[in-house]
Design a protein with these regions (language model features):
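Interdomain hinge/linker at the junction between the two RecA-like core domains of SF2 helicases
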Residues: 273-290
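Conserved pre-motif I regulatory segment
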Residues: 86-121
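Inter-Walker segment of RecA-like/P-loop motor cores
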Residues: 166-213
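SF2 helicase catalytic motif II
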Residues: 202-204, 218-259, 263-265
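Conserved Walker A/P-loop ATP-binding site and its immediately adjacent core
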Residues: 129-165
Length: 290
């Protein structure tokens, strides 16, 4: 309570104390945790802070509910760095996919039963992220790598992951900034059969010694037997010598690859007709009229 007073009094914040818990627990021996570890779990789970007073630093507050905080405490004790989407109290409901999105999902699932690659040639705002994640959910892929030339889109993938997997505790997301670390994801996959989506940037992987880079890193990522690799903005960076080297190391014999792009003109020659789903501006306008 003394700590709470320190962070509320100067900002004039009224509070209700709803729950207390000892910070000592047993996991192979006595351990303890602090509030910053719980805050880290909340932040990596996509839960936003509420800043009341930037001058007096009253910024250790989060917009969430008691049950989510209890789960965050439990996650710290279990050695996890985030909550699954199903553990965070949010008012999500199933996505109502448009007919063209349903067609892309259906065609991809059908293609992946007989082949290993698919290209979505779909214009901006098609909903490629949500639709691709629905493919992952429907096909129950255990290990999925999301690869992009634009690391900034991590937040968007993480948010959409929550919208698709809000009802599945057996799916987890991980990246440098959100969700779990790769090591934690793989550990949970091995021990509990967890399904996961790991987000990685092409720039980071290109610097790895495994593909001729200067740094001894990402060895585990390259060694993983990925079930699916989703390449976001696939026309960017994947056709260079280094980009091809990265894909060559990542893709194993049974790995499925789904490439997403609004302008895949440098990729089309590498795909057969039944390996491409197209939704362009003209098709969109026709759909609006009909």
């Amino acid at each position: 309570r003394k700590r709470i007073i320190q962070h509320t009094q100067t900002a004039g914040i009224a509070y209700d104390l709803l729950y207390t818990e000892l910070t000592v627990y047993n996991r192979g021996g006595l351990r303890s945790f602090n509030d910053k570890e719980v805050h880290n779990v909340l932040e990596r789970s996509g839960i936003k802070k509420k800043v009341f007073d930037t001058v007096n630093k009253a910024n250790e507050w989060f917009i969430t509910d008691l049950e989510t905080v209890k789960r965050a405490i439990a996650a710290v004790k279990e050695g996890r760095s985030s909550l699954s989407s199903a553990e965070v109290t949010r008012e999500y409901s199933p996505i109502a996919f448009r007919p063209e999105q349903q067609e892309a999902i259906s065609k991809t699932k059908k293609q992946f039963k007989k082949g290993n690659q698919m290209l979505w040639n779909a214009k901006m705002r098609f909903g490629k992220t949500l639709s691709a994640l629905q493919v992952v959910k429907d096909m129950e892929f255990q290990r999925t790598l999301i690869l992009t030339h634009r690391p900034v889109v991590d937040a968007g993938w993480f948010e959409d992951f929550g919208k698709i997997f809000y009802d599945r505790k057996d799916f987890a997301y991980g990246s440098k900034n959100n969700g779990e670390s790769y090591d934690s994801l793989e550990r949970q996959a091995e021990s509990h059969g967890m399904h996961y989506e790991d987000f990685a940037s092409l720039q980071d992987l290109r610097g790895s010694a495994s593909v001729g880079g200067n740094f001894d890193k990402n060895n585990e990522v390259f060694a993983t037997d990925w079930d699916l690799i989703i390449v976001d903005e696939a026309h960017e960076g994947t056709q260079t010598e280094l980009g091809k080297a990265v894909m060559g190391e990542l893709v194993k014999e049974q790995t499925k690859v789904l490439r997403l792009s609004g302008t895949p003109f440098n990729l089309l020659d590498d795909f057969k007709e039944d390996e491409i789903y197209t939704w362009d501006y003209v098709m969109e306008q026709r759909a609006k009229v009909s």
